[in-house]
């Protein structure tokens, strides 16, 4: 059972919070259904606040309470003032013929009003200070805490053990790091201050009500318990749905990140639509949840407003009774009514704050759960033994092991192995038998389930984890380089290494020569996952990185598998030298590389069945003997033909020209060359680069995306206008009510009051429907827009050409971050926010119209302050927009570092570079933090000005109002009407200004999204243009093709390459690492177009053929195959996305690739998930799946780039036979370093310096005694050494 496949499994851990949002194994679904929605406690959300943050929050809260108390206190002043006016009303009934007796009361009234104006101004000054401190301090505290949460979360991820990553998968963690922490940031900042402000307004309103008129307050409060209950239900519903919505978006984010990370594979197999469907499926789930949330929340909201208006009706009726019976003055009744009114309306204004806080609690549950998860193997721990010296004696004693993700499948079943200090031990055996697992256990990436592993007689569990890993150097099968310079990549081996030591290590690894040919030499950027370099070049840098550690123990897992013949011979010599004095464990499928090992251990089914030297094991005729026999048969012809001494050949022909050592960049089929002109500062993403050439977008353009939902907007806007107009309508009723309490018959007064009370009840019933419809329609339209934006953005990304993905700014991490944050920020200014803005605008607009009708002079005075509020709003928007832009760039830069570290966590851990990545990440968080500090002050100042102007305008209003009344220009009731209409309007305007930060962010994000939507790629994967030939024979011609990668125009790759392969022929491309072989494959796939010359298929230029048709004719198997985190069956079926591939066909394909028996041993067989990038499978198993994936599309042309390099001997033989069979009747282009696999090719082409130097059959090229002859000679010599 070749079951090393389980080694990096991603089956999900049962019984943990992550189950709520994971891609999830079927076995956990039942458990997850039973689980409750998880939220953390409100105070726990602030667990990362230090004394300074707590001080900020305390002062911010105190000031929020002071700010919130301002309006109810103002109502006391208003009540007293109303009594003054009503008492004096009889004196100012006539507009003309003033008598001397009227002048004195007029002067007294004006003096009284001046006193009240000072009260208002005093309150305004207090609010100016309080509002600034409230907003700025809460924003400052949030910025500081978010920085700490990001740091702690990233630190927690880096310290987890490998078994945790196997269960979790890495892609969702990146989504959590961007999306979820943004939600926490939204929930713990200024919105908390605004919540306390609203709560203070609520309580202050009721306290004032009780003091001024407890009877009336109690009557109004009778309805409050029902109101409170509906608010509680509303909050609960919101948080439940928010949690589910988060989970759906996390899944969508994981799909997007996976597809963007494997973009070449997606495009080559035409999988864009399939990825888009997978993505949209999760988005649809999120949308449905969002719509349900909108319905539930807004029914609660409608009920709340119905209850509020019902309480007003009751208040008016009872209040009028109290005034008529002389228990209350009209001023008292007004104070009580207005205080309760303002207090009750503050509940509605708290709604977005409660929503944001609920989202934050849901997001924080998952984040804090990960932070609190204590790993059993903690690489940050200082505990454990750190010996002064290590000899390097290793002992594996009865080691049993199963991967945590697949506890029921045993990998090692009693491994026993002793390695003496300085010895080299080679582990051999079939793919998936447990060899790599052994190396992982030695590094303590996992702990054995039974048995012990010791170094120098000490159990490795007693060593300090970091110390243990530092004495071990690792070179793995698929080396991971980081997106920085070559020198920095080598420095990851050991932090304090000098440049001289780097050069020494590079020379030992045979990489010095190719590095010195690069324009930037050691400062050349290697691209994401080392994509600028060929496989061989990456491998040599990885070897240099291991050597620079000067490790006591060296672990080589297929360290030379990706090298060409010449490099392999030289690197092998370097490794032999490096092994001197070190304990070395080697895994190699190419057995010629391990025959000089001191001990060779034969693995079979998780145990060592034999060990000894090469000659001893050959005599035993066991596992090793069988493997050697199978492997040597392939290269026998070579060894028979070359008994000649290589030195003689060189002397005779002057061969092995320097030319074929050429190290011009080749791009491994994963990604192309990316620009390195810019050195280190490119890593920081040039400050202006991200937003250069991104034109600003009008918000109408965003709304146009919602035009199909126009009926929702029409209904929502009408309802918002009605809701906005309801409040000024109350102003008219109020002024009429005050007018009733002049002189007159009490029975008539009571009758009129009853009528107005019924009007209020009617408004309540109306508001139930209008508030529900407003919230629901805008909410639904917002959810649809969100889904559409995300879907369009992802679709637009998948449409782009390779040169766009080669750009450093468009790395997987940056794109995933952009996909999550841009959508969230645009949604932040649409949907329910848009509804509130429409409502508040209608409120102010209606208020102004009514005010002009009843008193234009006073209205003009009040409106004269509006420009000041507007200017402060505009300044706020501009400054916040600048901050949003800087913030976005800095967070994307941090996101890239995090994504790279998380995706390559095994390499980071092996190199003990967790601290380095953490410090890089923390450094990138400084700028967003500095921005948040600036933003706090800007936002605080502008917010406080807009809030305080309201009070100053009231001071002016009533002072001027007194003058107008005294001079007979207005009646008191009209002053009240104008005042209250403008009060409600100004409150609304104040709340509208609080959305400025969201709007600033949304504008920037919208600009980014539209620049992406509108970008026309040079090669459009979605294009329907071009020829669709009925028949394709399969002949391929390259005519004088010249090509440089777009991002490095000064580095020629192909320089006039011409070659032809006829229908059904097999063409083999050979040449040294980096000579342009894979570039040929990429041009054929039309990842790029040649700069000069043509690529022809059946005589037709590739550019003229429809791109989808063209790629459908090609099947590709690359050097490092990329599998997707879905089932084995789905991965095989991915080969042909134009149809539904049947299960029978999938099984037949698996049998043909010799992987069916292995799949049958798995618990879920073909439904087994292969893990992130296929990490549950061994290299050989992945490669076999990739071959079947390519063949299932029945291509006319088969492209094999090192298709068998990762296979063990036994698998290689079987797969090679399968490939030989697959080639029948097909045109085949093969790239191979192992020349024994291509000797039967119809045509072998030797590429050097981007041109064809030799071509012919195996025999013809041998006869020429040229470059190919030398390559074969070296390889045959290595095979027989």
Swiss-Prot record:
Modifications the protein undergoes after translation, according to the UniProt entry: Phosphorylated. Phosphorylation is required for PC efflux activity. Phosphorylation occurs on serine and threonine residues in a protein kinase A- or C-dependent manner. May be phosphorylated on Thr-44 and Ser-49. Glycosylated.
Coiled coil start-end: none
Membrane topology classification: Multi-pass membrane protein
Annotated localization: Cell membrane; Apical cell membrane; Membrane raft; Cytoplasm
Activity modulation comment: Translocation activity is inhibited by the ATPase inhibitor vanadate and the calcium channel blocker verapamil. Translocation activity is enhanced by the addition of the bile salt taurocholate.
Residue ranges crossing the lipid bilayer per the database entry: 51-73, 119-139, 189-210, 218-238, 297-318, 333-354, 714-734, 758-778, 834-854, 856-875, 938-958, 975-996
Residues bearing glycans: 91, 97
ABC transporter domain span: 394-630, 1036-1274
Region (Interaction with HAX1), start-end ranges: 625-649
Catalysed reactions, as listed in the record: ATP + H2O + phospholipidSide 1 = ADP + phosphate + phospholipidSide 2; a 1,2-diacyl-sn-glycero-3-phosphocholine(in) + ATP + H2O = a 1,2-diacyl-sn-glycero-3-phosphocholine(out) + ADP + phosphate + H(+); a 1,2-diacyl-sn-glycero-3-phosphoethanolamine(in) + ATP + H2O = a 1,2-diacyl-sn-glycero-3-phosphoethanolamine(out) + ADP + phosphate + H(+); a sphingomyelin(in) + ATP + H2O = a sphingomyelin(out) + ADP + phosphate + H(+)
Region feature (Disordered): 1-24
Residues that hold ATP 2 according to the record: 536, 1048, 1073-1079, 1119
EC number: 7.6.2.1
Subunit structure: Interacts with HAX1. May interact with RACK1.
Listed name of the protein: Phosphatidylcholine translocator ABCB4
Name of the encoding gene: ABCB4
């Amino acid at each position: 059972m070749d079951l090393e496949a389980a080694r990096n499994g991603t089956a999900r851990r049962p019984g943990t919070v992550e189950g709520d949002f994971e891609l999830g194994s079927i076995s956990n679904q039942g458990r997850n259904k039973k689980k409750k929605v998880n939220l953390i406690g409100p105070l726990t959300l602030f667990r990362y606040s230090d004394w300074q943050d707590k001080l900020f929050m305390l002062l911010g809260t105190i000031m929020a309470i002071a700010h919130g108390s301002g309006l109810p206190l103002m109502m006391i002043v208003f009540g007293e003032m109303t009594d003054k006016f009503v008492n004096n009303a009889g004196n100012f009934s006539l507009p003309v013929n003033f008598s001397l007796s009227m002048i004195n009361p007029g002067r007294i009234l004006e003096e009284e009003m001046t006193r009240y104006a000072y009260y208002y101004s005093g309150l305004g000054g207090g609010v100016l200070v309080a509002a600034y401190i409230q907003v700025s301090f809460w924003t400052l505290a949030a910025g500081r805490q978010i920085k700490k949460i990001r740091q702690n979360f990233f630190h927690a991820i880096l310290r987890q053990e490998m078994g945790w990553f196997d269960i979790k998968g890495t892609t969702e963690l990146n989504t959590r790091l961007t999306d979820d922490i943004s939600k926490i940031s939204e929930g713990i900042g200024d919105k908390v201050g605004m919540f306390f402000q609203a709560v203070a307004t609520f309580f202050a309103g009721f306290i004032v009500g009780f003091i001024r008129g407890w009877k009336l307050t109690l009557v109004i409060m009778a309805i409050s318990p029902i109101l409170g209950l509906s608010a509680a239900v509303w909050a609960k519903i919101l948080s439940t749905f928010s949690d589910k919505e988060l989970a759906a978006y996390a899944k969508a984010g994981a799909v997007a990140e996976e597809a963007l990370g494997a973009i070449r594979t997606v495009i080559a197999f035409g999988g864009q639509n399939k990825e888009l469907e997978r993505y949209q499926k999760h988005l649809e789930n999120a949308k449905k949840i969002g719509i349900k949330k909108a319905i539930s929340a807004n029914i609660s909201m409608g009920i709340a407003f119905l209850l509020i208006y019902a309480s007003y009706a009751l208040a008016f009726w009872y209040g009028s009774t109290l005034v008529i019976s002389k228990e209350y003055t009209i001023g008292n009744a007004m104070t009580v009514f207005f205080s309760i009114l303002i207090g009750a309306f503050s509940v509605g204004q708290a709604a977005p704050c409660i929503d944001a806080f609920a989202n934050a609690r849901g997001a924080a549950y998952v984040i804090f759960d990960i932070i609190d998860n204590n790993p059993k193997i903690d690489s940050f721990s200082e505990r454990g033994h750190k010996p002064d010296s290590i000899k390097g004696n290793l002992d594996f004693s009865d080691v049993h092991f199963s991967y945590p993700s697949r506890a029921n499948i045993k990998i090692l079943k009693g491994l026993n192995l002793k390695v003496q200090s300085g010895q080299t031990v080679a582990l051999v055996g079939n793919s998936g038998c447990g060899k790599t697992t052994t190396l992982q256990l030695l590094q303590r990436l996992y702990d054995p389930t039974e048995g012990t592993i010791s170094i120098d007689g000490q159990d490795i569990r007693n060593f300090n984890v970091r110390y243990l890993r530092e004495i071990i150097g690792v070179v793995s099968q698929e080396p991971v380089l980081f997106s920085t310079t070559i020198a920095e990549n080598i420095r990851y081996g050991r932090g304090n290494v000098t440049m001289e030591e780097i050069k020494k290590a590079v020379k030992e690894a045979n990489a010095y020569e190719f590095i010195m040919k690069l324009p930037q030499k050691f400062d050349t950027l290697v691209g994401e996952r080392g994509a600028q370099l060929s496989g061989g070049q990456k491998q040599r840098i990885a070897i240099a990185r291991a050597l620079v550690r000067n490790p006591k123990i060296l672990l080589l897992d297929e360290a030379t598998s990706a090298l060409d013949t010449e490099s392999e011979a030289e690197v092998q010599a370097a490794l032999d030298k490096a092994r001197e004095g070190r304990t070395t464990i080697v895994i190699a499928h190419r057995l010629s590389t391990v025959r000089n090992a001191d001990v060779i251990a034969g693995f079979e089914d998780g145990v060592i069945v034999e060990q000894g030297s090469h000659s001893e094991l050959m005599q035993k005729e066991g596992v090793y003997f069988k493997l050697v026999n199978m492997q040597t048969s392939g290269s026998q012809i070579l060894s028979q033909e070359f008994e000649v001494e290589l030195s003689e050949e060189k002397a005779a022909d002057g061969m092995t020209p320097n030319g074929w050592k050429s190290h011009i960049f080749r791009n491994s089929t994963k990604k192309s060359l990316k620009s390195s002109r810019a050195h280190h500062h490119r890593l920081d993403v040039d400050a202006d680069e991200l937003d250069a050439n991104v034109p600003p977008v009008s918000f109408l353009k965003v709304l146009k995306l919602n035009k199909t939902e126009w009926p929702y907007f029409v209904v929502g806007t009408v309802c918002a206008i009605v809701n906005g107009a309801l409040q000024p309508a109350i102003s008219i009723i109020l002024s009429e009510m005050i007018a009733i309490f002049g002189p007159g018959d009490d029975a008539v007064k009571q009758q009129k009051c009853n009528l107005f009370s019924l009007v209020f009840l009617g408004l309540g019933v109306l508001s139930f429907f209008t508030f529900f419809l407003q919230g629901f329609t805008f909410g639904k339209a917002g959810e649809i827009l969100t889904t559409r934006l995300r879907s369009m953005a992802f679709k637009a990304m998948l449409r782009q050409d390779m040169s766009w993905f080669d750009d450093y700014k468009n790395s997987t991490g940056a794109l995933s971050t952009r996909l999550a944050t841009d959508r969230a920020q645009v949604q932040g200014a649409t949907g329910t926010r848009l509804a509130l803005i429409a409502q508040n605008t209608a409120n102010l607009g209606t208020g102004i119209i009514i005010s002009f009708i009843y008193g234009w002079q006073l209205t003009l005075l009040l409106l004269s302050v509006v420009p000041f509020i507007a200017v402060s709003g505009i300044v706020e928007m501009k400054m916040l927009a600048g901050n949003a832009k800087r913030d976005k760039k800095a967070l994307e830069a941090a996101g890239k570092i995090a994504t790279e570290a998380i995706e390559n966590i095994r390499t980071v851990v092996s190199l003990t570079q967790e601290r380095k990545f953490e410090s890089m990440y923390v450094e990138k968080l400084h700028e967003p933090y500095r921005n948040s500090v600036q933003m706090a002050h800007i936002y605080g100042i502008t917010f406080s000005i807009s809030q305080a102007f309201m009070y100053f305008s009231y001071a002016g209003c009533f002072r001027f109002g007194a003058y107008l009344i005294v001079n007979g220009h207005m009646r008191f009731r009209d002053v009240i009407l104008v005042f209250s209409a403008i009060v409600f309007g100004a409150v609304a305007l104040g709340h509208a200004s609080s959305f400025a930060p969201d709007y600033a962010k949304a504008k920037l994000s919208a600009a980014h999204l539209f620049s992406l939507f509108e970008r026309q790629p040079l090669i459009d994967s979605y294009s329907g243009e071009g020829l669709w030939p009925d028949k394709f024979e399969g002949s391929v011609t390259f005519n004088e093709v010249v090509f440089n990668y777009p991002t490095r125009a000064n580095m020629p790759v192909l320089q006039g390459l011409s070659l032809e392969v006829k229908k059904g022929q097999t063409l083999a491309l050979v040449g040294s690492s980096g000579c342009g072989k894979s570039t040929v494959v990429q041009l054929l796939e039309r990842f790029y177009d040649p700069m000069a010359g043509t690529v022809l298929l059946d005589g037709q230029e590739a550019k003229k053929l429809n791109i989808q048709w063209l790629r459908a004719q090609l099947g590709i198997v690359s050097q490092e195959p990329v599998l997707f985190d879905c089932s084995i069956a789905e991965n095989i079926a991915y080969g042909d996305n134009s149809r539904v591939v049947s299960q029978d066909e999938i099984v037949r394909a698996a049998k043909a690739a010799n992987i069916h028996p292995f799949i049958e041993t798995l618990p879920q067989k073909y439904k087994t998930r292969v893990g992130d990038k296929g990490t549950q499978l061994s290299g050989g198993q992945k490669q076999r799946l990739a071959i079947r994936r390519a063949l299932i599309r029945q291509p006319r042309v088969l492209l094999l780039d090192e298709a068998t390099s990762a296979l063990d001997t036994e698998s290689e033989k079987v797969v090679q036979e399968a490939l030989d069979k697959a080639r029948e009747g097909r045109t085949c282009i093969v790239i191979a370093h192992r020349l024994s696999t291509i000797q039967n090719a119809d045509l072998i082409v030797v590429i050097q310096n981007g041109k064809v130097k030799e071509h012919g059959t195996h025999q013809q090229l041998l006869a020429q005694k040229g470059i190919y002859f030398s390559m074969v000679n070296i390889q045959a010599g290595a095979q027989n050494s």
